[in-house]
Regions:
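P-loop/Walker A NTP-binding region and its immediately flanking N-terminal helices
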Residues: 1-145, 152-161, 169-173
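Short loop-to-helix capping motifs
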Residues: 18, 220-221
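Conserved H-loop
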Residues: 165
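Conserved AAA+ ATPase "sensor/coupling" helix adjacent to the nucleotide-binding pocket
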Residues: 177, 193-202, 231-232
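Conserved AAA+ ATPase "SRH/arginine-finger" region at the nucleotide-binding site
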Residues: 180-190
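An amphipathic alpha-helix signature
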Residues: 188-196, 215
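C-terminal helical "lid" of AAA+/P-loop NTPase domains
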Residues: 212-217, 223-235
Length: 242
């Protein structure tokens, strides 16, 4: 397993940086009324990791028991469109932009189906199901309009978590219906702390000059930094670590 997957935080308490954002997510979990959410920020900053940790905090460890399904949709000319769904009993993750110009069709069908389906686990901590929409800023205007209508109609039993690099291409009616959560690129010191944590867990010594170089060249992309660390693993005894 790659380091980036092996050491990805699974709980809010394990998140390594942006403590103010972690506190905000913990407050959301404690709240009885969770709004639609829009996570935005540069690639590799940790948006998906925070969404995954939030889902576990909302629903428990069952949110990490995932399955992958391939769904087939027919466009107006009866051509098949295949889209992969990642789901647990409590949430579904989709990337509608995989459907290209037919993303509106995917949004309408999947969200309507999920919204009209009862929570599988009757003892679930939350009565609503959650849909995570990746690359929300790549959705067409038609798909975003369909999404807006869905947000209004099915708020009672469904919440949306949108993930995007930027909010600039997301229509105002969607932004106004979401709590905006910015996940900024971490500082080099934050990235270095993550790298030291991985190195310690893997029992090898990571010189400060190497971790500094990796962090600087990663330009705030933690995923990239960890991948580079694995490639450049320094074969020095763990006894150097305190």
């Amino acid at each position: 397993m790659l380091y980036v997957d092996k050491y990805r935080p699974k709980d809010l308490s394990e998140l390594n940086y942006h403590p103010h954002l972690t506190e905000q997510l913990e407050s959301l979990v404690a709240s009885a009324d969770v709004p639609h959410l829009l996570f935005y920020g540069p690639s590799g900053a940790g948006k998906k990791t925070r969404i995954t940790c939030l889902l576990k905090a909302l629903y428990g460890p069952g949110a990490h028991k995932l399955k992958v399904d391939q769904r087939v949709f027919l466009n107006p000319s009866k051509r098949k469109i295949e889209v992969n769904l990642i789901s647990s009993n409590y949430h579904t993750e989709i990337t509608p932009s995989d459907a290209g110009i037919y993303d509106r069709l995917v949004i309408q069908d999947i969200l309507k189906e999920i919204a009209q389906t009862q929570q599988v686990d009757q003892n679930a901590a939350r009565r609503f199901k959650t849909v995570v929409i990746n690359e929300a800023d790549s959705l067409s205007r038609d798909a975003q309009a369909a999404l807006r209508r869905t947000m209004e109609k099915y708020m009672r039993n469904m919440r949306l978590i949108l993930c995007a690099n930027s909010t600039s291409r997301i229509i105002a009616p969607i932004r106004s219906r979401c709590l905006l959560l910015r996940v900024g690129a971490p500082k080099d010191e934050d990235v270095m702390r993550v790298l030291r944590h991985v190195a310690k867990r893997e029992k090898f010594h990571l010189p400060d000059n190497i971790s500094s170089d990796i962090a600087r060249n990663a330009d705030g992309n933690v995923r990239k930094a960890i991948l580079v660390l694995e490639t450049l693993r320094v074969p020095v005894s763990y006894t150097h670590l305190t």
